Every structure is written in structure tokens, then in C-alpha cells.
């Protein structure tokens, strides 16, 4: 029996799955501890249900994912609005240095993924399913690039990317705090703590205050950026390279944001844009998760384990040997290490949870609380999308 859902029914089911995930996360402490997104919790359960139905021959589900693409583009447009060059400049040398460290991390994750895939004699694009797409990118980027890789002939790429992203969330949360603690105690870093000015954090918080009357204007800015983005995407396609559908919208949004910041002729309503983007991300993830075909993971189970183990070992070595030393070899650097594990293998909320755990035990770190969310949220996703696009087109 085949059960077909139109785009409205698919959206409604995604919302129900989202609500189920939120309900379970509020009641299962472990899910909340690891910051597992509500759409992932409910979506995995539904995907298991559809897998059982498929394997037993009871039913097969077919979904209309038209609205999934709309929500995906709107979310990544909101990410594009985060690319504020003024913030990058105000962060000073430390911001530039950390951004460079993150760029190297993104590129290295993909080189490692492709290299291990070649050693395992699997398609390099399968390797990319465990690279920076799910690691730095998380579930949002996994859901966006999975279909792109499927268009290149990688069956079940979305499922692979999502499985890797879920693993990354858990692994990044589990190792961030312990690594930070180890570095602090091994190198006696409490002696390196110095008082810092938190005015930049306060300034950003004020800028992102929400006003209900501004949500329509924020929506219009998002829609305009999406419209301009379609033109940019068509122009980019003339290069012969394959780009994700949202890349033009991200570039348009970044241009609008910086025109507003530097020109001063109009206001970009970032708080409201962030909220709308967050809603679209939840809906996009909900629809992406219910369409997972987890039975496609079976034949790639062993390569997937090896690829993810390689990424985990690399992350530990990278943050301890590179991030810690380049960022100052002090207490702040140790807290940054814990945060980098969070967003380098999962998402920025995991990074913040890791840092909070370390800071609650020892001392606050204004530097870490400034760098991690700004680089992790504002610039990492934007740069990651560009790097992934290059890898997909040239391997």
C-alpha cells in the first residue's frame, strides 16, 4: 500500500513530528543534555516507523516536499543576514584568527572524509556525507546538501548526512567539556584568567532585541533577498558548477545586511530575522526527517562507522594541538576548545552548552562567549556552504 501526502499534509505531519520531539525532549533529560533538536527526535522515531512499514511491506510513504525547499531557502537566507563585516572587524585580531582556524577545520574535515573514503574504496561523495556537511554544518546543512549529493548519484545521501549529524551532536557534546577540563587542569590555566570587557556582548544583545511590529518588515527583507538570490543563483550556474539553491539568497542577504550597516539608510531587523529563520529551520528539519529512508544505511554501515571515528579522532587532535595553541594556550583558549567541539561536530547551541558547563565549574570567559557564537553562527555556515560546493564540483 502506498500512502501519498500532498505538500499541506506533509507540512502538517512535520509540525506534529516537531511537537512530538519537543514533548519528548522536555521529559527525557538525556535528550535535553545533548541539545538534540526537537525535529530530529520526533523525525527519527517517525523514520523508524516508516522503515518498519517498508521492510514488512505494510506501507510505503510518499511526500510532496515543495514547502521543504521554501523553508530551507528562507532559513539559509536568514543565515546570510548574519554575515556582518562590522562585527568581524569589531572582534579584532582574535576574531580573524579564530575564523581562520575554523576555515582550516572545515577544509580539513572534507579532505579527511574524501581521503578515508578512497581508502575504504567507497565513492568520495559518500565520504563528504561525513565531512563538514554534517560536522560543522549540522542537521540544517545535512538536509540541504543531502539531496544535492543524491542528484550526483549517491543513494541515501540525505539519510547518511543526517545520521552523521546526529552522531556529531552527541559526540561533540560529550567531548567538549572533558577536553576543556583536561586542558585547564593539566596546564594550571586558572592562573591565566584576566578580567575582560563584555561591552561587545551587551551591544550585540541590544541590537537583537525583538519588537512585534517589526516582524512584517523582517519578513519582507527575507523575501526580497530570496527573490534577488534566485537571479544570483542562475548567474552562478552559468559557471558550470553545481550550487545549492539557497547560495544566491545567502549572498544577497549578506549584501543587504552590510549595505544597511555601512550605508545607514535602512535597518536590518536581525532579531526578528533570526526568529523567522529559526521557525523555518524547524519546519525544514521536520519535513527532511520524515522523508528519511533509513533502510538505505544498511550497506554503508561499516564505512560510516570508520568515517565518523576518523572525524572524531581528528577533532580531538585538532582542538588540542591547533585551536588551543593558536588561540593563546590560556584559560580562554581552553573554553574555546570546548565550544569548538560543540559547533565543529554539531551546532552552536551545543557549543554554548559545553562552554557553560566549563565556565560554571571554573570561571566565565567573555572572549570565548564572544568568538564562538559570532564565528559559529555568523560566518561558519556561510563559508562552509562555499567550501562544500567547491568539493562537490571538483572531486
Residue ranges and their predicted role:
Residues 116-160, 167, 179, 194-195, ...:
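Alpha-helical membrane segments and immediately flanking helix-loop junctions
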Residues 230-308, 314, 319-326, 339, ...:
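Membrane-embedded translocation segments of transport machinery
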Residues 51-55, 110-118, 143-149, 283-296, ...:
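Hydrophobic alpha-helical transmembrane segments in multi-pass integral membrane proteins
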Amino acid at each position: 500500500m502506498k500512502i501519498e501526502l500532498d505538500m499541506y499534509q506533509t507540512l502538517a505531519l512535520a509540525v506534529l513530528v516537531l511537537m512530538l520531539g519537543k514533548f519528548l525532549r522536555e521529559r527525557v533529560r538525556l535528550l535535553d543534555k545533548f541539545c538534540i533538536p526537537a525535529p530530529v527526535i520526533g523525525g527519527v522515531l517517525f523514520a523508524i516507523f516508516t522503515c518498519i512499514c517498508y521492510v514488512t511491506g505494510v506501507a510505503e510513504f510518499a511526500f510532496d516536499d515543495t514547502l521543504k525547499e521554501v523553508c530551507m531557502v528562507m532559513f539559509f537566507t536568514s543565515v546570510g543576514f548574519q554575515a556582518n563585516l562590522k562585527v568581524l572587524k569589531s572582534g579584532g585580531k582574535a576574531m580573524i584568527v579564530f575564523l581562520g582556524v575554523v576555515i582550516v577545520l572545515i577544509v580539513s574535515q572534507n579532505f579527511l572524509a574524501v581521503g578515508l573514503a578512497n581508502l575504504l574504496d567507497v565513492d568520495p561523495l559518500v565520504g563528504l556525507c561525513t565531512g563538514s556537511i554534517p560536522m560543522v554544518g549540522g542537521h540544517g546543512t545535512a538536509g540541504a546538501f543531502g539531496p544535492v549529493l543524491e542528484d550526483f548519484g549517491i543513494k541515501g545521501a540525505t539519510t547518511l548526512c543526517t545520521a552523521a549529524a546526529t552522531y556529531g551532536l552527541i559526540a561533540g557534546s560529550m567531548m567538549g567539556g572533558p577536553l576543556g577540563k583536561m586542558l585547564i587542569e593539566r596546564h594550571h590555566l586558572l592562573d591565566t584568567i584576566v578580567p575582560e570587557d563584555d561591552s561587545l556582548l551587551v551591544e550585540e544583545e541590544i541590537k537583537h532585541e525583538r519588537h512585534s511590529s517589526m516582524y512584517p518588515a523582517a519578513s519582507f527583507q527575507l523575501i526580497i533577498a530570496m527573490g534577488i538570490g534566485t537571479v544570483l543563483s542562475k548567474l552562478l550556474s552559468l559557471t558550470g558548477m553545481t550550487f545549492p539553491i539557497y547560495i544566491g539568497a545567502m549572498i544577497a542577504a549578506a549584501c543587504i545586511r552590510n549595505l544597511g550597516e555601512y550605508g545607514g539608510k535602512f535597518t536590518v531587523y536581525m532579531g526578528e530575522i533570526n526568529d523567522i529563520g529559526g521557525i523555518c529551520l524547524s519546519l525544514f528539519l521536520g519535513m527532511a526527517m520524515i522523508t528519511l529512508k533509513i533502510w538505505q544505511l544498511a550497506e554503508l554501515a561499516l564505512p560510516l562507522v570508520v568515517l565518523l571515528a576518523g572525524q572524531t579522532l581528528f577533532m580531538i587532535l585538532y582542538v588540542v594541538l591547533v585551536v588551543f595553541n593558536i588561540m593563546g594556550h590560556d584559560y580562554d583558549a581552553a573554553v574555546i576548545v570546548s565550544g569548538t567541539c560543540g559547533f565543529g561536530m554539531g551546532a552552536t547551541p551545543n557549543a554554548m552548552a559545553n562552554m557553560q558547563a566549563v565556565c560554571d565549574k571554573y570561571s566565565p570567559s567573555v572572549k570565548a562567549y564572544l568568538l564562538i557564537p559570532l564565528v559559529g553562527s555568523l560566518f561558519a555556515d556561510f563559508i562552509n556552504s562555499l567550501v562544500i560546493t567547491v568539493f562537490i564540483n571538483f572531486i
